[in-house]
């Protein structure tokens, strides 16, 4: 690499961020709980535009996607040992391929981040409004109003400094991951003898390797943002050490969570694509909801979670 480790970059902060802080940046941006709830159905293939996906073998698709993510993480880690700048990927590409390509990559990457965050804020605003209306019959704000409130809240947190924002991400990520992981473990324990290695066998995919690799394409989306710790290199006391550790640790954490989540969403619905499709919009909610709420996940007599959650009738796992 052409850049020197001592390259003189303008600093944004006073190097107060710890390793947990920069890990929180990557994990928080990646949003493993959100992705587990709404992106995994794409990996399975029940809501993908092509109609293809890993199917029952979706966990295998996630594992293969993780291999590529680890390779990318190694590249980012290698560059971060040499270049300690807030531009991260922009600076890496500029160093390797020149300013013109780096500028294009920077606009594409950070433009994509802005579009992604805008979309998420709109989605969350709509979800909050819809949930309050349907569950509590109240609607204090329209969906766009909640989006404005959330945007203002994020702005306030950022105003007080990156250390506050990363700590907030750390707390929120830990709480949400612990809760969801506990649910995953609960379902796996309740599955008992119904647990199987079937989701890790290529033959479990209805479309064979074609479907599995379609699942890989969507599986990569699960990891979007895992490399963003590199943006905080200027604000860490030892970026050569802490950024590579943060990036690779995030990749490991994400892989474990997503493989378990995908397995639970496949096994919890009785290894049945038809059943997964019936709850594709929000599979984790369906899997954990009581039968009186109309849940389809894990119902029935002998396969999948079948009575492991709040779902006790026999209509689902018989499919």
Which functions belong to the PLM regions below?
Residues 60-64, 132-162, 180-184, 306-311:
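Transmembrane alpha-helical segments of multi-pass small-molecule transport proteins
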Residues 13, 79-82, 104, 130, ...:
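Membrane-water interface regions at transmembrane-helix termini and the short interhelical loops
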Residues 12-13, 55-59, 135-145, 170-294:
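Helix-loop-helix junctions that connect adjacent transmembrane segments
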Residues 36-42, 46-49, 157-163, 310-319:
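Transmembrane helix-loop junctions in multi-pass membrane proteins
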Residues 1-16:
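Short, Lys/Arg-rich, polar N-terminal cytosolic tail immediately upstream
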Residues 99, 114, 144-148, 237-255, ...:
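Loop-to-transmembrane helix boundary motifs in multi-pass membrane proteins
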Residues 32-138, 253, 260:
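Extracellular loop-to-transmembrane helix junctions
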């Amino acid at each position: 690499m052409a850049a020197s480790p001592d390259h003189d970059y303008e600093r944004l902060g006073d190097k107060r961020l710890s390793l947990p802080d920069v890990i929180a940046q990557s994990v928080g941006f990646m949003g493993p709980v959100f992705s587990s709830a709404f992106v995994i159905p794409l990996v399975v293939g029940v809501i993908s535009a092509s109609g293809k996906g890993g199917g029952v073998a979706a966990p295998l698709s996630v594992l293969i996607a993780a291999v590529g993510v680890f390779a990318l993480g190694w590249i980012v880690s290698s560059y971060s040992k040499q270049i300690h700048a807030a531009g991260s990927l922009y600076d890496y590409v500029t160093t390797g391929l020149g300013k013109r390509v780096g500028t294009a990559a920077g606009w594409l990457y950070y433009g994509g981040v802005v579009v992604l965050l805008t979309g998420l804020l709109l989605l969350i605003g709509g979800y909050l409004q819809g949930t309050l209306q349907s569950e509590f019959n109240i609607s204090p704000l329209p969906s766009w109003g909640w989006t404005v409130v959330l945007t203002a809240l994020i702005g306030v947190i950022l105003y007080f400094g990156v250390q506050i924002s990363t700590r907030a991400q750390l707390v929120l990520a830990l709480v949400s991951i612990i809760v969801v992981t506990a649910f995953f473990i609960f379902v796996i324990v309740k599955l008992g003898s119904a647990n199987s290695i079937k989701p890790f066998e290529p033959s479990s995919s209805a479309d064979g390797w074609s479907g599995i690799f379609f699942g890989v394409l969507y599986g990569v989306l699960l990891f979007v943002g895992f490399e963003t710790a590199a943006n905080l290199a200027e604000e860490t006391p030892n970026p050569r050490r802490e950024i590579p550790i943060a990036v690779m640790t995030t990749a490991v954490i994400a892989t474990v969570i997503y493989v378990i989540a995908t397995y639970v969403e496949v096994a919890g619905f009785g290894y049945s694509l038809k059943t997964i499709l019936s709850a594709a919009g929000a599979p984790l909610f369906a899997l954990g909801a009581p039968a009186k709420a109309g849940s389809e996940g894990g119902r029935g007599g002998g396969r999948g979670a079948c009575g492991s959650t709040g779902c006790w009738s026999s209509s689902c796992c018989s499919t």
